[in-house]
Swiss-Prot record:
Cellular component, GO, one term: cytosol
Family under the similarity heading: Belongs to the CsrA/RsmA family.
Full protein name: Translational regulator CsrA
UniProt entry keywords in alphabetical sequence: Activator, Cytoplasm, Repressor, RNA-binding, Translation regulation
MF term (GO), any: mRNA 5'-UTR binding
Gene Ontology biological-process annotations: mRNA catabolic process; negative regulation of translational initiation; positive regulation of translational initiation; regulation of carbohydrate metabolic process
Length: 64
Protein backbone atom coordinates (compact mmCIF):
# COMPACT_ATOMS: atom_id res chain seq x y z
CA UNK A 1 0.00 0.00 0.00
CA UNK A 2 1.29 3.41 -0.96
CA UNK A 3 0.85 5.95 1.85
CA UNK A 4 0.90 9.65 0.98
CA UNK A 5 0.55 12.79 3.05
CA UNK A 6 -1.53 15.64 1.63
CA UNK A 7 -2.72 18.91 3.11
CA UNK A 8 -6.15 20.45 2.59
CA UNK A 9 -6.36 21.67 -0.99
CA UNK A 10 -3.63 19.35 -2.26
CA UNK A 11 -4.31 16.75 -4.94
CA UNK A 12 -2.94 13.38 -5.92
CA UNK A 13 -3.25 11.77 -9.33
CA UNK A 14 -4.16 8.17 -10.11
CA UNK A 15 -3.05 7.53 -13.65
CA UNK A 16 -3.71 10.36 -16.11
CA UNK A 17 -7.45 10.79 -15.58
CA UNK A 18 -8.31 10.43 -11.89
CA UNK A 19 -7.54 13.13 -9.33
CA UNK A 20 -8.24 13.01 -5.60
CA UNK A 21 -8.26 16.30 -3.67
CA UNK A 22 -8.33 16.71 0.11
CA UNK A 23 -11.18 19.15 0.74
CA UNK A 24 -11.14 19.23 4.52
CA UNK A 25 -10.28 17.50 7.77
CA UNK A 26 -12.57 17.66 10.80
CA UNK A 27 -11.81 15.40 13.74
CA UNK A 28 -11.44 11.87 12.40
CA UNK A 29 -13.24 12.60 9.11
CA UNK A 30 -11.54 13.56 5.88
CA UNK A 31 -13.54 15.05 3.00
CA UNK A 32 -12.16 14.22 -0.41
CA UNK A 33 -13.18 15.17 -3.92
CA UNK A 34 -12.67 12.76 -6.80
CA UNK A 35 -12.56 13.72 -10.47
CA UNK A 36 -12.79 10.70 -12.75
CA UNK A 37 -14.15 9.95 -16.21
CA UNK A 38 -17.78 8.80 -16.31
CA UNK A 39 -16.70 5.29 -17.30
CA UNK A 40 -14.71 4.91 -14.04
CA UNK A 41 -16.92 3.75 -11.16
CA UNK A 42 -16.22 5.45 -7.82
CA UNK A 43 -17.95 4.06 -4.71
CA UNK A 44 -17.45 4.04 -0.95
CA UNK A 45 -16.19 0.59 0.07
CA UNK A 46 -19.44 -0.43 1.81
CA UNK A 47 -21.47 0.48 -1.28
CA UNK A 48 -19.04 -1.36 -3.56
CA UNK A 49 -19.33 -4.49 -1.39
CA UNK A 50 -23.15 -4.29 -1.50
CA UNK A 51 -23.12 -3.96 -5.30
CA UNK A 52 -20.70 -6.88 -5.57
CA UNK A 53 -22.81 -9.06 -3.26
CA UNK A 54 -26.01 -8.24 -5.14
CA UNK A 55 -24.27 -9.23 -8.37
CA UNK A 56 -23.17 -12.54 -6.84
CA UNK A 57 -26.73 -13.24 -5.63
CA UNK A 58 -28.14 -12.45 -9.06
CA UNK A 59 -25.77 -14.93 -10.68
CA UNK A 60 -26.64 -17.62 -8.13
CA UNK A 61 -30.39 -17.21 -8.73
CA UNK A 62 -30.15 -16.84 -12.47
CA UNK A 63 -30.56 -13.08 -12.41
CA UNK A 64 -34.22 -13.04 -11.34
Amino acid sequence: MLILTRRVGETLMIGDQVSVTVLGVKGNQVRIGINAPKDVAVHREEIYERIKNEGDEGQATGGN
